[in-house]
Curated annotation (Swiss-Prot):
It comes from Ostreococcus tauri. Belongs to the ATPase A chain family. It is a multi-pass membrane protein. Keywords: ATP synthesis, CF(0), Chloroplast, Hydrogen ion transport, Ion transport, Membrane, Plastid, Thylakoid, Transmembrane, Transmembrane helix, Transport. This is ATP synthase subunit a, chloroplastic. It is found in: Plastid, Chloroplast thylakoid membrane. GO terms for cellular component: chloroplast thylakoid membrane; plasma membrane; proton-transporting ATP synthase complex. Pfam families: ATP-synt_A.
Length: 236
């Protein structure tokens, strides 16, 4: 029965806190986010430092990433996609690297006074912040293009749908945040449980599966963000 005690002892998402201005912040989330941003910046700098007409090495990878993100934005946003490609690309890269960091970086080897390090996206505060930022962005996109006429979409095609259309603006960030948080947290929890039971062999395929699903989650989030922006920009 000892293995049952091992499973019950598995914890994901423990926190240590920093106090700033009377507010309690999850310190490890900030540390992990800075590490992720540092990795993204380092990748961008090293792969674009010596650009050549015929790309090779890291420049090939950088151009592939840029073209991939641009295609997502073009497909989802439409005619005005170039203006919103940087935002969609930033979301995609931050979520993608955050998710992969949880699977590839041995965070547990770094000891903290309290809590543990892990992927920023396994914290609900991170995913909610990303979802709210997405909501604010598509509101801004609609208001920038249409002005106050943007709010006319809430009574289209009939004013009876006003409550449903308003409710939709609340469900979008909820679905974005909980989908990402739930998938990443569940993946880390399953791997942690299996590692406690069979430390070497069985968890390895699940780690590769986690890498795949982590990439898919980043793609889904970025695609939906682009779709929401495109919806805000299109005519009634």
């Amino acid at each position: 029965m000892n293995f049952l005690y091992d499973i019950s002892a598995v914890e994901i998402g423990q926190h240590f806190y920093w106090s700033l201005g009377g507010f309690q912040m999850h310190g490890q989330v900030l540390i992990n986010s800075w590490i992720v941003l540092g990795l993204i910046i380092a990748f961008a700098v090293t792969t674009t430092r010596d650009l050549k007409p015929v790309p090779e090495g890291g420049q090939n990878l950088a151009e592939f990433v840029v073209e991939y993100i641009r295609d997502i934005a073009k497909t989802q946003v439409g005619h005005d996609y170039l203006e919103w490609t940087p935002f969609i690309g930033t979301l995609f890269l931050f979520i993608f690297v955050s998710n992969w960091s949880g699977a590839l970086i041995p965070w547990k080897l770094i000891e903290l006074p309290h809590g543990e390090l892990g992927a920023p996206t396994n914290d609900i505060n991170t995913t909610v912040a990303l979802a709210l930022l997405t909501s604010l962005t598509y509101f801004y996109a609609g208001l920038k293009k249409k002005g106050l006429e943007y709010f006319g979409k809430y009574v289209q095609p009939t004013p009876i749908l006003l409550p449903i259309n308003v409710l939709e603006d609340f469900t979008k960030p909820l679905s974005l945040s909980f989908r990402l948080f739930g998938n990443i947290l569940a993946d880390e929890l399953v791997v942690a449980v299996l590692v406690s039971l069979v430390p070497l062999v069985i968890p390895i395929p699940l780690i590769f599966l986690g890498l795949f699903t982590s990439g898919i989650q980043a793609l889904i989030f970025a695609t939906l963000a682009g779709a929401y922006i495109g919806e805000a920009l299109e005519g009634h």
